[in-house]
Each structure stands twice: as C-alpha cells, then as structure tokens.
Amino acid sequence: MELTLEGDVVRAGYEARERFYDSRGYGKVRNGDIDLAPVEAAHLLYRGDIESIDGMDFRGFLGSAAVSEVDFAVYKDLRDRGFYLTPAREGWVDDAAGADFVVYPRGKGPWDNEVAYRVRIIGERDTAVATDLGGCVLAVVDEESEVTYLDTDRREVSGTSDAAVPATAGELLGERVVCWEPPAELYEQAFYGQQLGDDGAVQLSLVEAAYLTQEGMLTVEGGADAVVERGREVEGDRFDRRLAVYTALRASGVAPKTGFKFGADFRTYADVESAENLGHSELLVRVLPADHRFEPRDLALDVRLAHGVRKTMVFALTTDGGDEIEWVAVERLTP
C-alpha cells in the first residue's frame, strides 16, 4: 500500500479508505481516497497496519518533524481507551477552533453527528491561557508520556443564600472590621464574618466589610472608601479583583467564605439557611486576571486538592475593572 507525505497530510488510496476510514474512523475522505493526519498515520505505523511512509518506519516517522510525540501520546491513549477521534482541522470537523482532537462517543465515529469531547493538548512544561479553557478537555502529557485529562467548563454560579440583613455599624481595626452589636441575622442567617465569642460580636474580613458598606448594610468611619483603601494597602490590586468576585457571588445567591486552608480565595455555600445548619461548601474559587497563564502542574494540584475534599475547582477570571467575570470549572476526567 503506497502512502506519501505531502505537506501536512499523508495521502492514501481507496484500499486505505476501506481498511482505515470505513471500518476504524481514520482520516478524511477525499475524492474516494483518504487523507490521514500525520498523527493518525503514525498510529497506523505503530500498530503495524502500514509498513512505511516515504520509506520511514514508525521510529523514523515519529522522529521526523511531521508529527508531535505529545499529540501521538494523546491519540494513542484515546484509541487504546476505545475511542475514534479526528484531528481538529478546517474542513475535517464542523468546528476546528479551540481543539486539537474531536473525540466521538464509544461505538461512534466521524460519520455520526455526535461528539463526546473536544480535546486540547499541552505538555507539562507548556502553559495554558485561562481564557482558552471552557468547553474543552485539557489533555496534559507529562514527561513520562502519561496523560492527565482535565474537563473544563464555563458555567454560571448560583444559589439561594440571600438572607436580608438589617443595617449595622462596625469599627475598622487593622485588617478586620468588628461589629460589636450586630443583628443576629448578620452571622446566623446570612453567614457574614465570624463570631468573636459568646457576647455576640462579629468580626468581618475586609472583603466582606467592603461589600457590606458598598451595599449600605454596614457603616464604618470613613465609609466604604476607608475599607477599600485598607484592603488595597494589604493586598494591592488583588483586593479589587477579590471584591468584584465576592460581590458577584453574593449577587448570585452564593455565600463566600475564605478558602485559605484549601489554597483558594473562597469556598462557597449555595444554600445557606442558618450558620447552625450549614452543609458542606461546594466550590473552591480562585480569583485570577483574565490574561493568566496556568502552569499545568499548578492546575493539576488545584484540581486534585478540590477533588480530595469533595469540591469543584472554579476559576474566576476578571478584567482589570472587574466589570466582567468568567467562571471556569475544572475537574479531573477519566474518558
């Protein structure tokens, strides 16, 4: 069987179409023949289904500039798991943007109109642009060519934690605001702050206090500007991003609390009825600028930690002014 490499495709004839496309979903039909992407041809060489391409065996072809060993590791892994898949090329799949492979449900192929996963591939020493995530599976290939799959999804964050709070007064002390005589609803129903003791006083974080003052539910000397200024003194621009995300979470009916012990900005509760009958938090939220680039190792660590404590990792991507927030959930996936 004669196969030749022409540019970025491997040309194969009608016999190859019958053997590889019709029965196993390799390649793209072209005038009765098929074109193979180099990674597909490399897999056929690896399996021994073809002997050579332009005189190159599997070892020679994989070592050439025609095919990426990182792409091959993912392609082979997904084929080993029983999936048919197509390289995401213009004219080969309906929507090629934002993916490297389009993976079909088991038992389906490129002739069906079903897609299981859109896969984007990176090596462990590459970086992933935060805004590129969502609506795809990130396949990370480590130095031993093992593949970790991370499902990324853009979603809305919402809940029913919207208890009303009567206005109260507080005192700005260092990096906290203390409400000495707060209404019971502040902590018990709306889950703001932490109680200092049995006397009923509640201490608020700066981000909680800034939100409450801006919403007119808390008064402090100097007003909201004093709290925000203090927040910027201790956190810089990060405080404004965290405040924007905190505000958006509260507006969506979600009660955020510090996520420090989990290495996150917030942990969130979607359905708070009272502080005494509190369920488990559902999300860990990290606040990041929209132009953030993830190191795969850090991303895998965040997701692994969230999974270990039965939560979902969500990244809140903020613009400079915090006017727009995109929520990207990332979870481990076993295809």
Swiss-Prot record:
One MF term in the entry's GO annotations: tRNA-intron endonuclease activity
Family matches, as InterPro entries: tRNA_endonuc-like_dom_sf, tRNA_intron_Endo_cat-like_sf, tRNA_intron_Endonuc_cat-like, tRNA_intron_Endonuc_N, tRNA_intron_Endonuc_N_sf, tRNA_splic, tRNA_splic_arch_long
EC code(s) of this entry: 4.6.1.16
Catalytic reactions of this protein: pretRNA = a 3'-half-tRNA molecule with a 5'-OH end + a 5'-half-tRNA molecule with a 2',3'-cyclic phosphate end + an intron with a 2',3'-cyclic phosphate and a 5'-hydroxyl terminus
Active site, renumbered: Y269, H280, K311
Domain of life (superkingdom): Archaea
PANTHER family: TRNA-SPLICING ENDONUCLEASE SUBUNIT SEN34, TRNA-SPLICING ENDONUCLEASE SUBUNIT SEN34-RELATED
Family membership noted in the UniProt record: Belongs to the tRNA-intron endonuclease family. Archaeal long subfamily.
Protein name, per record: tRNA-splicing endonuclease
